[in-house]
From Swiss-Prot:
Zn(2+) binds at H59, E62, H151. GO terms for molecular function: hydrolase activity, acting on ester bonds; succinylglutamate desuccinylase activity; zinc ion binding. This is Succinylglutamate desuccinylase. InterPro entries: AspA/AstE_fam, AstE_AspA_cat, Aste_AspA_hybrid_dom, SuccinylGlu_desuccinylase. Belongs to the AspA/AstE family. Succinylglutamate desuccinylase subfamily. Transforms N(2)-succinylglutamate into succinate and glutamate. The gene is astE. The keyword Zinc-finger does not apply. One of its GO terms (biological process) is arginine catabolic process to succinate. Pathway: Amino-acid degradation; L-arginine degradation via AST pathway; L-glutamate and succinate from L-arginine: step 5/5. Its cofactor is Zn(2+).
Length: 335
């Protein structure tokens, strides 16, 4: 197998490859673009016009998606997987991956769409670097741009695998893309309705890609992801990579759709959630329930019918989102 097929090993060891560019037996060019970054380019005669960005490890302890990308890269390097798409593989936060932690100083996935310019430190620089890598990759005109940013969650979830679909003024969410997510094993999609500072929001908003954050189960250490079923996602990614994706059924009846009702923002150190520490994502909330409290008598009271909570995290820094209140929605507004 080609040495560049061992991108994960190189990244975890903090080493550069001796050869920055290698060709597979199929004539596929693999090019090391920097730490944790590998571009894969098929021969021109096989290129089908798709640019696929696959990122994982934005949070260093979310290992199941990192292992999935490692398997795909190795399959390409061996010649088992024969790309017709251009692909950029990114391991988002190598320092945190090496430490087995979510981040070192700052959450990289809160530093996109201009936020890194307001901050400092190694992780702000990494967010800037990831933006530049993505912008360069998606710079070719007249191509189909797709980005999946793969994650696992801090906590358990009543819906184990789900996606977050970014928002941009004047742009509709795509029914076809939702059908693709359903085929890839996602059971629910959160349709966002305001700008965001995560990686997929940057590529969606600034680079014109169809972009998604995929949550694939609970975060576990390397080698302990046997309970995370990524087979449907892996199959769909292999089909996209090889240009053999079956026709998609745009019937979305089996896909649960949600929209954002409100974001819960932590203002001060006095912030508290009135939730059990082990509360799961998508847990239902009764109308009138006092969800959270902060200094000065500030309270978050559930006003919405059918409300649920996702990503509750009272440990975030002041000024950041500590959770999201979501409500069911339908496919009526889709493009």
């Amino acid at each position: 197998m080609l040495a560049l097929g061992k991108l994960l090993e190189l990244t975890l060891a903090g080493r550069e490859p001796a050869e920055k560019t290698q060709l597979t037996v199929e004539g596929v060019r693999m090019r090391w673009m920097g730490e944790g970054a590998l571009e894969v380019r098929p021969p021109q005669v096989r290129d089908n016009g798709t640019d696929l960005l696959l990122s994982a490890g934005i949070h260093g302890n979310e290992t199941a998606p990192i292992e999935l990308l490692d398997e795909l890269i190795r399959s390409i390097a061996r010649g088992d997987l024969k790309p017709r798409a251009r692909i950029l593989f990114l391991f988002g936060n190598p320092d945190a991956m090496r430490r087995g932690t979510r981040f070192v100083e700052q959450d990289v996935n809160r530093l996109f769409n201009g936020r890194h310019e307001q901050s400092g430190g190694a992780e702000a620089l990494r967010a800037c670097e990831l933006e530049h890598l993505a912008a360069s990759f998606f710079s070719l005109p007249d191509r189909y741009r797709l980005h999946y940013d793969l994650h696992t969650a801090i906590r358990g979830s009543k819906i184990e695998q789900f996606a977050l679909y970014p928002w941009k003024e004047g742009r509709q969410h795509s029914r076809l893309e939702l059908a693709r997510l359903r085929a890839a094993g996602m059971s629910a999609v959160l349709l966002q309705n305001k700008p965001s500072i995560v990686f997929s929001a940057y590529t969606y908003d600034q680079l014109g890609a169809e972009a998604f954050t995929l949550e694939l189960g609970k975060a576990r250490p390397f080698g302990q992801n046997q309970q995370v079923n990524l087979a449907p996602l892996r199959l769909r990614l292999e089909q996209i990579i090889e240009g053999r994706e079956p026709e998609l059924d745009e019937n979305l009846e089996e896909l649960q759709l949600f929209s954002v009702a409100r974001e819960v923002i932590k203002r001060t150190d006095a912030f508290t959630f009135n939730l059990a520490d082990a509360v799961e994502n998508f847990s239902p909330l009764e109308k009138g329930y006092v969800l959270a409290e902060d200094a000065g008598g500030s309270r978050w009271v559930v006003e919405e019918d059918g409300a649920r909570i996702i990503f509750p995290n009272p440990k975030v820094k002041n000024g950041l989102r500590a959770g999201i209140l979501i409500v069911p929605t339908d496919a009526g507004s889709l493009g």
